[in-house]
Design a protein with these regions (language model features):
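Glycine-rich phosphate/dinucleotide-binding loop and adjoining beta-alpha-beta core of small-molecule
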Residues: 1-110
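Short glycine/threonine-rich catalytic loop with a Thr-x-Gly-x-Asp
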Residues: 112-123
Length: 123
């Protein structure tokens, strides 16, 4: 199940997202489903497991991992994030990074930078 794009950032989406994360085994979280937890990050972290995938772009990433330095490489960023959560991470950007639950990292050098722009959606 995919949740997040265009969902809004209020209490309702947070409540729905929490319910889905508890009840649905395989979930992809993007956009609003991630950033609605910006004031309750520990709750988000606790709900993520090996069957969940988060797909932030850089701006969303720093909202859900505010303590991770912005001036380090994206590979270092996702490695630091992996210490906080137990899920898969797709960090969207000109070179999209994929960090699997088992800690393997794949770099997609062929992703389009236009698709990593806020609001472009996940095409």
């Amino acid at each position: 199940m995919l949740i997040g794009p265009g969902a809004g950032s209020g209490k309702k989406i947070k409540k729905i997202t929490k319910l889905i994360l508890k009840k649905v085994k395989y979930v992809v979280l993007d956009a609003d489903a991630l950033t609605c937890f910006k004031n309750d990050l520990q709750k988000l972290y606790s709900l993520l497991d090996k069957n969940k995938i988060i797909t932030p772009h850089t701006s969303e990433f720093h909202k859900i991992f505010p303590k991770i330095k912005k001036n380090i490489t994206n590979i270092k960023k996702i490695k630091e994030a992996r210490k906080l959560i137990k899920s898969n991470i797709i960090l969207k950007g000109p070179n999209t990074l994929i960090l699997s639950y088992d800690k393997n990292i794949v770099v997609n050098y062929h992703s389009s930078p236009e698709l990593a722009v806020i609001g472009s959606g996940d095409v």
